[in-house]
């Protein structure tokens, strides 16, 4: 490995650590507050509904999986669903309506007042995530947005904003 390669990897790791430190400082109170609200919603019989595109879709699936299975400790399963997993539903909505509707129609089908809608968009501008939040708000769901860059449209419309102050998709995700 060359010195230039080592320097490049070190710079990437330094950028990651700096982003993580900024995010920790800015989001710690919000994470604690929204964590309590998510616990309360689940205790009242609500569920977590996650969604996003690309890498954010994978994050949505991972989060839902950790809720249903376990995370760090043995515990009963928690109700969660990722709207990114059913290709028949996604492609039929995308084909018959528009890709911007793939999550909002599912929210209207499975979401209920008191549930949690957690959408992810590194830009904060993904039309299908924005529309899903609009649908979730109409139903009475609590909304959590995970964004980067400047937070986009999502920053103004969610109950809780988890904003990573970075323009780098790998750092945001």
List PLM regions with ranges:
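Generic N-terminal amphipathic, Lys/Arg-enriched alpha-helix
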Residues: 1-26
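Glycine-rich, small/polar surface segments that engage phosphate groups of diverse ligands
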Residues: 37-111
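Short glycine/serine/threonine-rich phosphate/pyrophosphate-binding segments
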Residues: 56-61, 125-132, 154
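A charged, well-structured terminal subsegment
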Residues: 109, 116-117, 172-173
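Short alpha-helices
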Residues: 147-173
């Amino acid at each position: 490995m060359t010195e230039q390669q080592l320097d490049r990897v070190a710079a990437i790791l330094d950028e990651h650590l700096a982003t993580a430190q900024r995010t920790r400082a800015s989001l710690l109170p919000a994470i604690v507050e929204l964590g309590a609200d998510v616990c309360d919603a689940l205790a009242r019989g609500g569920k977590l509904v996650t969604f996003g595109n690309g890498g954010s879709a994978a994050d949505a699936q991972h989060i839902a999986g950790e809720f249903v299975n376990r995370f760090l400790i043995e515990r009963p399963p928690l109700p969660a669903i990722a709207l990114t997993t059913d290709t028949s539903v996604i492609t039929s909505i995308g084909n018959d309506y528009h890709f911007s509707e793939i999550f909002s129609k599912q929210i209207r089908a499975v979401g209920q007042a008191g549930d949690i809608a957690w959408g992810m968009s590194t830009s904060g501008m993904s039309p299908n995530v924005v529309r899903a939040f609009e649908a979730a708000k109409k139903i009475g769901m609590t909304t959590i947005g995970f964004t980067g860059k400047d937070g986009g449209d999502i920053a103004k419309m969610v109950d809780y904003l988890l904003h990573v102050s970075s323009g780098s998709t790998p750092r945001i995700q």
